[in-house]
């Protein structure tokens, strides 16, 4: 049975005059349609993901295609049971993806070769190839291509510095890079070329497109793909499912992300429902005892209940040491 909602994912590097004015107009239009989602607009283009009914998303796509700037923009479509967002944001930003380079990269001028899923799949298996995940560490930890390098970064803007520190491992290699939908790799692969790396390619359409390819069927992907909406993750490999995520507290296989209940921390943790309960969705003792702990507020916990939970954790910690 066809689902009644869809999630759209798209981007286009294209010059947008008066982006702040276009941002306000686009927000109004999206709200009128009843869409929910997050869209970034800058002078260098548009990068968005929205959810809505089939009818709403169809109207939205038709409007985008009617604009000469976005007429040839690929739009990835996922069926959904309902909205994947809670609100509608359209924001103006200086960059579509934040790299803060002194010498900025224009992907329309300099970017890596685009590889279709089958070509990417075959190139990954070349022993002279190195595959770099251009996403954040918490995205990698939930799922990644088999054998891909995990840059130790918490934000995309940290990636160039990480590459500079590890450039020896890339010397003489064919470089493949990938991200969720492709927007980050457009700039990152261009930056690699500017830094003198000669053989640089990127996964055309990103992980999302790779998982939908009827021939490759997501093979050589392990785990789930992290997405920035209420779904949190989506499947990729349609041939075999290998769980690589590990529970933050116990290390057991898990693919469920939560955020630390201390708003000042908000650390992303892979965590089972049982351990979310046991540890009050908090990454540390300091976060569990923080006066602003959201888990405590959500469950209306009394101080007695909090103390009982803390005592149990302390008892088990001592037992583990002994």
From Swiss-Prot:
It catalyses: uridine(34) in tRNA + AH2 + O2 = 5-hydroxyuridine(34) in tRNA + A + H2O. The keyword tRNA processing applies. Its EC number is 1.14.-.-. Residues 125-219 form the Rhodanese domain. GO terms for biological process: tRNA modification. One of its GO terms (molecular function) is oxidoreductase activity, acting on paired donors, with incorporation or reduction of molecular oxygen. Belongs to the TrhO family. Catalyzes oxygen-dependent 5-hydroxyuridine (ho5U) modification at position 34 in tRNAs. This is tRNA uridine(34) hydroxylase.
């Amino acid at each position: 049975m066809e689902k009644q909602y869809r999630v759209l994912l798209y981007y286009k590097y294209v010059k947008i005059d008066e982006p702040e004015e276009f941002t306000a107009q686009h927000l109004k239009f999206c709200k009128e349609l009843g869409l929910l989602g997050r869209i970034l607009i800058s002078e260098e283009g548009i990068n968005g993901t929205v959810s809505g009914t089939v009818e709403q998303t169809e109207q939205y796509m038709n409007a985008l295609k009617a604009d000469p700037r976005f007429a040839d923009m690929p739009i990835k479509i996922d069926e959904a049971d309902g909205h994947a967002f809670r609100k509608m944001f359209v924001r103006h930003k200086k960059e579509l993806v934040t790299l803060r380079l002194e010498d900025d990269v224009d992907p329309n001028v300099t970017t890596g070769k685009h590889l279709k899923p089958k070509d990417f799949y075959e190139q990954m298996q070349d022993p002279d190839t190195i595959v770099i995940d251009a996403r954040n560490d918490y995205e990698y930890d939930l799922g990644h291509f088999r054998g891909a390098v995990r840059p130790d970064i918490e934000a995309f803007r940290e990636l160039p510095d990480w590459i500079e520190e590890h450039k020896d491992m890339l010397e003489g290699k064919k470089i493949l890079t990938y991200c969720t939908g492709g927007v980050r790799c457009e700039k990152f692969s261009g930056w690699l070329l500017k830094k003198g790396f000669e053989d640089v390619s990127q996964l055309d359409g990103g992980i999302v497109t790779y998982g939908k390819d009827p021939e490759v069927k997501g093979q050589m992907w392990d785990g789930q793909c992290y997405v920035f909406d209420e779904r949190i993750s989506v499947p990729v490999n349609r041939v075999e499912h290998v769980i690589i995520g590990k529970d933050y507290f116990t290390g057991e296989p898990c693919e469920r992300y939560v955020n630390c209940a201390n708003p000042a921390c908000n650390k992303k943790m892979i965590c089972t429902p049982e351990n979310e309960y046991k540890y009050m969705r908090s990454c540390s003792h300091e976060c569990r005892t923080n006066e602003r702990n959201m888990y405590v507020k959500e469950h209306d916990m009394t101080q007695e209940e909090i103390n009982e939970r803390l005592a149990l954790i302390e008892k088990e910690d001592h037992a583990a040491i002994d």
